Amino acid sequence: MQLQDEAYLPDVARAEWALHRCASAPDRLADPASLTLLTTLEPDALRLYLAPGCCIVRSDWPVVSILDAHLHGTPSLAEVGAQLRASTPQELVVWRSGLRPVFRQALPGEADLLSALLAGVSLGEALDAAPALDFGQWFPLSIQSQLVLGVHHEI
């Protein structure tokens, strides 16, 4: 077996590189008081502060499962093998929580939202780019996990 026969390896390398780069991303402090802007301004006038090193890795392969199996022991390697044979696509979200790089599988629509936010658009535009996202589910999770650190008003 040659490495070139393992089509998923470049995506796993991109995911591992994202985790590595995340570890040395510049620090940013959370600003929980800024969340009140969500109650007073329209989403088109707001931007979200994302955690250091935040990025998305989109893959035609089960990169999240591969990383989880190797780093956390679950799912089993047999389960990952089945996902590889089925070419199960996954989207990986990477960010730093405190000083620790973390990752998880993206929620439906989350990769579209984060890609738009990382491109510098307003929250309103990002929400338009992610119609599949349940923002009511995603936002509390993103605050609790320190993926979103605050909100600021676009000038």
Where are these regions (language model features)?
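Long, charge-rich, low-complexity alpha-helical segments
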Residues: 1-40, 99, 104-155
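A general structural signal for short secondary-structure junctions and capping/turn motifs
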Residues: 11-12, 44-49, 83-85, 140
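Short secondary-structure capping micro-motifs at structural edges
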Residues: 40-44, 78-81
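Hydrophobic, aromatic-enriched interface-forming segments
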Residues: 26, 40, 46-58
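N-terminal start-of-chain detector that recognizes signal peptides
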Residues: 26-30, 46, 65-66, 86
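Low-complexity, glycine/alanine/valine/leucine- and proline-rich hydrophobic stretches
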Residues: 50-119
